[in-house]
Regions:
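Short, intrinsically disordered, low-complexity terminal segments
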Residues: 5, 19-24
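Bacterial N-terminal signal peptides that target proteins for export
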Residues: 1-11
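Bacterial N-terminal signal peptides
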Residues: 9-19
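Short, polar/acidic, helix-capping and beta-turn segments at strand->helix junctions
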Residues: 24-181
Length: 181
């Protein structure tokens, strides 16, 4: 490669790296550090109250059971979106659900730095029949995953409305994660 071409390539790479926010670079490199930067402290999750396990590892994938929004006091948010919760409150519930999933994932792996990427998410929203902004609700979760894992937090996703969810929680999300080799 000619010297001029190498210089052009290096300049372009520098521009690309400078255009990526520092927080996204940190997130991709070290999600554990990124959680600290965000002020998020993961707790040890309570054991399931039904006959299932929170996570199953198969090869380099981890399948996480559905989780709901747990408030700071340890209680679930309860109610229907469009009745007890506004869109913004429901997005916050989805974010809290993301924290619950990260707690379950860390309990399974011991270290979130083992995560290569978030692969697939199913977001379920307990909403009144006329509510149709399910995808916007689940953005509360998806935004958190990108904040924590950078571009590796972007994922395939379905967001659906439900007539009810266990314990009358407003949001339940399940997730599939790929691990580093």
């Amino acid at each position: 490669m000619k010297k001029e071409n190498r210089l052009a390539v290096l300049t372009l790479l520098g521009i690309i790296l400078l255009s990526v926010p520092a927080s996204a670079q940190t997130a991709a490199a070290n999600p554990e550090a990124r959680l600290k930067e965000l002020g998020i402290k993961l707790k040890t999750p309570a054991p399931p109250s039904a006959n299932f396990i929170p996570a199953v590892k198969v090869g380099n994938l981890v399948f996480l059971s559905g989780q709901g929004p747990v408030k700071e006091d340890g209680n679930f948010m309860i109610g229907k979106v469009g009745k007890e919760f506004t869109l913004e409150e429901a997005k916050y519930a989805a974010r809290l659900t993301g924290i619950s999933l990260l707690e379950a994932l860390k309990a399974e792996l011991g270290d979130l730095n083992k995560v290569k990427r978030i692969v697939k998410v199913l977001g379920m929203v307990n909403a009144v029949p006329e509510f149709d902004k399910h995808s916007q609700v689940i953005n509360g979760f998806s935004d958190l995953m990108v904040e924590v894992f950078g571009e590796n937090g972007r994922h395939a996703r379905s967001a659906v409305g439900m007539g009810s969810l266990p314990r009358n929680i407003p949001v339940e999300i399940e997730m599939i994660v790929e691990l580093k080799n």
